[in-house]
Amino acid sequence: LVAEHVDTSKYKIHTEEWREDNGDRQLENILTYIDVYYIDADNNNYHLAFQLTNGKFTTDGPERNDRQTNSYACSTPLDLEAIDFDYLQKIGEKADALVMSDEEGKTLTLKSAGMFRFRVWPVSLSNVDRWNRSEEYRAESQQMQVQFELNYVDESESPEYQGRFTVTNYYTVAFTADAAGEVAIDD
């Protein structure tokens, strides 16, 4: 979907974010929003938003930011091919294992993925000199960073009924991961 709308030979994608429905269908694990941020060769920044509408992702097209803040030449594009099913399964399983080993007697069940954000921090125009001087900074600016949230319910808690609505308490746990799939709970 993203590759259909963003020509990666002309633009460098630096951030892609997926979010589930945060309304009536929350906890149903339905991907509803996709946001993509990218830069063109003239250092213009763009945001492209997709929303699930009637079973299809739609977009109004990219929005160009008025300010030039990031360097196209120095920024490393996000490797979309690295974000595949195997990688997602790997970090999801590691995150779930961290939660299960951390809880005290709670019977938590994974209900949904609330958000995934994949990012290679773009090099800001104000840091181009630092990028040119520092090999360490250059290496840091090429690393994919992942933030994600998983939603759990405690099976020992009963749902609450408020009129005709059923309210389920859930716990959101935030995680970070790297390109190698190492996962940590995000403080």
Where are the language model's segments positioned?
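Generic detector of leucine side chains in alpha-helical contexts
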Residues: L1, L27, L31, L48, ...
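Broad, structure-driven detector of short, well-ordered beta-strand segments within folded domains
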Residues: Y46-K56, K111, F116-F118, Y171-A177
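Charged interaction patches that mediate protein-protein contacts
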Residues: L1-V2, A177
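Long, charged/polar, surface-exposed segments that mediate recognition or autoinhibition
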Residues: D60-F118
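A short, surface-exposed interaction/processing loop segment used at functional sites
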Residues: N54-L80, R164-D187
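Sec/Tat-exported extracytoplasmic proteins
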Residues: V2-V6, Y38, A95-E103
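Compositionally biased, low-hydrophobicity segments enriched in charged and small polar residues
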Residues: V2, Q26-D35, D42-S75, F85
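Exposed beta-strand-loop-beta-strand "reactive/processing" segments of non-cytosolic proteins
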Residues: E4-A49, P122-V173
